[in-house]
Amino acid sequence: MSAISLINSGVAWFVAAAVLAFLFSFQKALSGWIAGIGGAVGSLYTAAAGFTVLTGAVGVSGALSLVSYDVQISPLNAIWLITLGLCGLFVSLYNIDWHRHAQVKCNGLQINMLMAAAVCAVIASNLGMFVVMAEIMALCAVFLTSNSKEGKLWFALGRLGTLLLAIACWLLWQRYGTLDLRLLDMRMQQLPLGSDIWLLGVIGFGLLAGIIPLHGWVPQAHANASAPAAALFSTVVMKIGLLGILTLSLLGGNAPLWWGIALLVLGMITAFVGGLYALMEHNIQRLLAYHTLENIGIILLGLGAGVTGIALEQPALIARGLVGGLYHLLNHSLFKSVLFLGAGSVWFRTGHRDIEKLGGIGKKMPVISIAMLVGLMAMAALPPLNGFAGEWVIYQSFFKLSNSGAFVARLLGPLLAVGLAITGALAVMCMAKVYGVTFLGAPRTKEAENATCAPLLMSVSVVALAICCVIGGVAAPWLLPMLSAAVPLPLEPANTTVSQPMITLLLIACPLLPFIIMAICKGDRLPSRSRGAAWVCGYDHEKSMVITAHGFAMPVKQALAPVLKLRKWLNPVSLVPGWQCEGSALLFRRMALVELAVLVVIIVSRGA
């Protein structure tokens, strides 16, 4: 099958699964199976289409028969298709067992519609259609939030972003007479894109991507959403915003230097602040949401380095920046899916998202515990996992930036490298905090003490994603050259070689070798050891003796108190009078439903 045929089949499966899951929503278990199987098949088709184009290194175009509009799949957006397909596959399988929980509501309609709209946005050949599909995707996500308050904030900020994007599209039409991306690219080679339109696009798509300070909806939406929904927010919805920013920045291939510098600065702020705020959180899903912001910033650093390379006409910098950013985009989606789905498995068995109420989960849920450890290590960019591989290439782009001709680039290169290293240290602290407080020590509540293993499909999905994280790190020397085909600019191969991180991975991982040998040699002697209670100065062990998440983060909280005080100023809710009114939440939800219905009718009528 051709890539276009695969995409048509994938979108058809998503839509069919959404409709059937809604029709059978009166039977929750059956609805879950329909949504899960249909979503998994649609995701497989989507990933296959992306893989076909990426390995072929040649873009294809055609029509999406369901809605009758032109689409294009380039090696660049093929990476988004692979990311959506892989994450959607395991989220869909996980979602089948998720429906077994008594407190869970049917979500097959929203999840599969979100996936279908996201795929259509990625392959859109027209910027206007891109914005419309991204809007449908965001509205589906609004209805996946746990309650009206979170959905209200997302809806309000989303409409602001859509308004800015609509203005940008209108200005593009006025200046270039088209919204077709291929025609825009050709015409902008003669008449470059204006910075006013670029700024509107960056703010509009930045609201969707969650770039700080445009991130207000991100922690609230993730905090109490279902695990499958939170995983899709992080791995699908926010990534579409990054695609929009990159698409605008690459049009015409003549970006000015300050665009790249602006993306680098925004990326560094987002990465550092996101990592810092994550360390202060105790709700595991809100914590992971802030870490998503951190990784959005890291991806933006890579993309910004690539755009800076375009302005400076440095092919090596373009290759390192874009390849590093794109590889980290894929890797982040994998390990963040592990973490959100793993956290959801813990909630499924304990009913708690507050890590202060957990503890000792590692003994109760060993499979999830090991998978979460892999995901947390990848999040902290520890070798030999995929999180390290992507960041290593981004570090290389900073080294190349330091050797460029522009003074501001030479100045930023070392500063960004140091800033990313500090952000990595915060991520390591957060990894130790989450795993230590949640999975080690003694249980702090009866629910944690009585936890049992997660259902089969949930465990399989989390473990499979964790294995993908290992493969993404170990197989980086073979995967990175494939991504070079996604760089949408003509480059000289001799000047764009990306240093493969395998040797560095192995060297850094060498200290683990003695521990592995010791575990193998002494494994048979461990059961014969006698065990007894630890000496605690004559007192019996109490639950209060275990280190808490609050205590773990206290030194950093005291050292960086001025930065943490900015949180209330970065929260848009505090700036809007009357926002907390109970009636406004229901009003916004109804407005979202009306807008979604209108957009769906318009899209369907185009294909009729």
What are these regions (language model features)?
Residues 18-22, 275, 434, 513-523, ...:
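Alpha-helical transmembrane segments
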Residues 28-39, 152-159, 285, 289, ...:
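Alpha-helical transmembrane segments and their helix-start/interface "positive-inside/aromatic belt" motifs
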Residues 37-50, 161-169, 372-384, 461-478, ...:
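Hydrophobic alpha-helical membrane-insertion segments
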Residues 90-100, 105-130, 139-450:
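Hydrophobic transmembrane alpha-helices and their helix-loop junctions in integral membrane proteins
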Residues 479-505, 521-608:
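Aromatic-capped, Gly/Pro-kinked transmembrane alpha-helices
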Residues 57-66, 182-186, 393-408, 478-498:
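Membrane-interfacial helical/loop segments at transmembrane boundaries in membrane proteins
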Residues 1-9, 16-109, 177-189, 485, ...:
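Transmembrane helix-loop-helix hairpins at membrane boundaries of multipass inner-membrane proteins
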Residues 2-6, 68-77, 128, 184-191, ...:
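Interfacial loop-to-helix junctions that mark the boundaries of transmembrane helices
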